[in-house]
């Protein structure tokens, strides 16, 4: 199985040179597509250097500015549709997502259309050093989203995922309007509404080792509001799903 892992970057100069070799150390037929939003810390140049070190295995997509997580993924997905890739991965560049978990996710993708790296299934967890309030906020945000959208999934807000290429290609991506972190919720909801089979694999979600987190309380509040917009945007698909039961 040929896999391409998409890694959006913005100021990940400390993390990217460590993550790429870690991914290539896995027993997988894996390539990497870095999507850099003109990082001022030189991440784009580092990505180019990695592409030179690993020719044909690392590709870099340079964008003109900080255009956002959702547009980075959507642009990358579309660029891979004409490729021979079998599966497309999503992961953060900051080691919040343990690269080794991809091995189990690849095993599951044989029988699923989408595999989620899940913090909230048995065996999954969040950083042991997080304070209680942060663990509670993360769990509440996830519970809130999946409850409002009535999805029978345990982790809909996480960003560690593996898609079958055919699944992404069959989805109406032109309808995806979310920006920022709510993008992960919208994509899971759209896949679920369309009836795709979604599996979950337990992961340990670690705090970033290097660099500064881009998550903030403001972003989380905005995401809570936008969950309702996601539900409204796909009410036609939800209606069809209800009729099909």
Predicted regions located by residue number:
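A conserved acidic beta->alpha catalytic loop
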Residues: 36-45, 65, 95
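Short glycine/serine/threonine-enriched helix-capping/active-site loop
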Residues: 90, 116-118, 201-203
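Short beta-strand/loop segment that forms part of the nucleotide-sugar
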Residues: 30-39, 61-62, 91
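Hydrophobic helical membrane-anchoring modules
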Residues: 1-3, 143, 150-151, 173-245
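Acceptor/aglycone-binding surface of glycosyltransferases and processive sugar-polymer synthases
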Residues: 61-82, 87, 99-181, 208-218, ...
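Acidic helix N-cap motif at the loop->helix transition within catalytic regions
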Residues: 14-18, 41-50
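Short, acidic, metal-binding catalytic loop of nucleotide-sugar glycosyltransferases
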Residues: 21-30
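Active-site beta-to-alpha loop of glycosyltransferases that engages the nucleotide-sugar donor
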Residues: 7-20, 38
């Amino acid at each position: 199985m040929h896999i391409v892992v998409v890694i959006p970057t913005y100021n990940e100069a400390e993390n990217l040179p460590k993550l790429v070799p870690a991914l290539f150390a896995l027993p997988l037929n894996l390539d990497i597509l870095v999507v850099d939003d003109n990082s001022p810390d030189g991440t784009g140049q580092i990505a180019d250097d990695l592409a030179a070190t690993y020719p044909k295995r690392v590709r870099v997509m340079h964008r003109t500015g900080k255009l956002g997580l959702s547009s980075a993924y959507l642009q990358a997905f579309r660029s891979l549709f004409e490729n021979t890739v079998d599966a497309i991965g999503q992961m953060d560049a900051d080691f919040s997502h343990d690269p080794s978990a991809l091995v189990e996710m690849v095993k599951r993708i044989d029988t699923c259309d989408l595999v989620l790296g899940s913090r909230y299934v048995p065996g999954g967890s969040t950083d042991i050093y997080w304070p209680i309030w942060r663990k509670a906020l993360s769990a509440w945000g996830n519970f809130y989203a999946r409850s409002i959208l009535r999805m029978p999934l345990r982790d809909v807000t996480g960003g560690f995922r593996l898609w079958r290429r055919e699944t992404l290609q069959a989805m109406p991506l032109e309808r995806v309007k979310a920006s920022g972190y709510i993008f992960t919720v919208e994509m899971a909801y759209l896949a679920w509404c369309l009836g795709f089979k979604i599996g979950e694999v337990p992961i340990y979600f670690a705090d970033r080792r290097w660099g500064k987190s881009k998550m903030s309380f403001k972003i989380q509040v905005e995401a809570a509001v936008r969950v309702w917009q996601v539900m409204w945007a796909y009410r036609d698909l939800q209606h069809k799903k209800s009729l099909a039961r």
